[in-house]
UniProtKB/Swiss-Prot annotation:
Belongs to the poxviridae DNA-directed RNA polymerase 30 kDa subunit family. A zinc finger (TFIIS-type) spans 155-195. One of its GO terms (molecular function) is DNA binding. The DNA-dependent RNA polymerase (vRNAP) consists of eight subunits encoded by early viral genes and termed according to their apparent molecular masses Rpo147, Rpo132, Rpo35, Rpo30, Rpo22, Rpo19, Rpo18, and Rpo7. The same holoenzyme, with the addition of the transcription-specificity factor RAP94, is used for early gene expression. One of its GO terms (cellular component) is host cell cytoplasm. Residues 220-259 are annotated as: Disordered. This is DNA-directed RNA polymerase 30 kDa polypeptide. Keywords: DNA-directed RNA polymerase, Early protein, Host cytoplasm, Metal-binding, Nucleotidyltransferase, Transcription, Transferase, Virion, Zinc, Zinc-finger. Zn(2+) binds at residues 159, 162, 187, 190. The gene is OPG066. One of its GO terms (biological process) is DNA-templated viral transcription. Its EC number is 2.7.7.6.
Amino acid sequence: MENVYISSYSSNEQTSMAVTATDIRELLSQYVDDANLEDLIEWAMEKSSKYYIKNIGNTKSNIEETKFESKNNIGIEYSKDSRNKLSYRNKPSIATNLEYKTLCDMIKGTSGTEKEFLRYLLFGIKCIKKGVEYNIDKIKDVSYNDYFNVLDEKYNTPCPNCKSRNTTPMMIQTRAADEPPLVRHACRDCKQHFKPPKFRAFRNLNVTTQSIHENKEITEILPDNNPSPPESPEPASPIDDGLIRATFDRNDEPPEDDE
């Protein structure tokens, strides 16, 4: 492993030192056993190089150290002045991780992949202390196939483009409670998406019988043998009852008076 250059922070001075693989092993041996040491270092090296995200560094033009000490430490490291377009870095007043102070000072003094490597080491040490697995690749996921086997290729909807059953249903948009959601299927092989199949009802209206014939292959309509409801009497016209007066257009001839 390459040398890791560290700048250890203190209240009055800042010293620079180089930490080799031997020094890191000696430091880690204080927290973990030798049986877990090599696996932890190998895991931290792999994950730090794979998932390294370059942090956006703030320049000196918009970051200034505060000239005052905060009365109450509320855990906020940065404060922003919107009026003057400046940001201020607050110095922490409460020391944390006293048990891992040496490793935390090493993290503060490094940058880049070396800093990420030490952060993964600190995370792994804390997990080992608590007796939990730090490597997510070794954690077995819960299988829900006994409850619902949605992504089974045997029952999946085939893709109309490549005829593959390696498809996944996705809910694109949710709507009101009385409307169906917008669902699309995505094919993992040809990277195409398509609409789910729908049941089509072939309507054949007959004027004489007013019957609707559904597609027999999809569904069957059970006959309605219940007696018809009694015919209700036709309601009286409001005009005949004199409730509404007949109106005429001004271009029409006036009605004749009853003699």
